[in-house]
């Protein structure tokens, strides 16, 4: 049975580049797996047919989202044209926008994390709601938004979730 005396030393690693590379790769995999599994979030249930969840989402949307995305989910005018700041206006969440082009995991991440959910360098005025809304409340807002889409849009967006 090996003991700690059989483990490679730093000196032996420096003399054997293959062993050093293997040790480094192993360390990177271990650290990456630890970070991934300790921060992975289980997506809460987002059910646009659950009227209790939808009603909560409607109230939360009105108080947290409507000021930018519109009381009727219509978004800001000219939402596809950049502002002088280089940022895009808030998009609509009705069927005329692109919200339904994304799976629930992306929508949830953007709502919870705000700018941190976007690729590096992307600028947005979308705030992070992870500190002001619980995961269940974010899910309720998304359920409310989805409940306003036509059935065909709901079906198409749902198929994006199945592909993940």
Where are these regions (language model features)?
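N-terminal intrinsically disordered, acidic low-complexity segments at the extreme N-terminus
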Residues: 1-2
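N-terminal Sec-pathway targeting helices
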Residues: 6-25
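C-terminal capping alpha-helices of c-type cytochrome domains
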Residues: 22, 26-36, 105, 127-159
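Short N-terminal helix-initiation segments at or just after the protein's N-terminus
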Residues: 28-43, 71-74, 90
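Electrostatic cytochrome c docking/interface patches
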Residues: 36-60, 155-157
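Periplasmic/extracellular electron-transfer cofactor-ligation site
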Residues: 52, 58-89, 112-122, 147-155
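Extracytoplasmic electron-transfer domains, predominantly the class I c-type cytochrome c fold
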Residues: 82-147
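Short, solvent-exposed mixed-charge patches
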Residues: 163-164
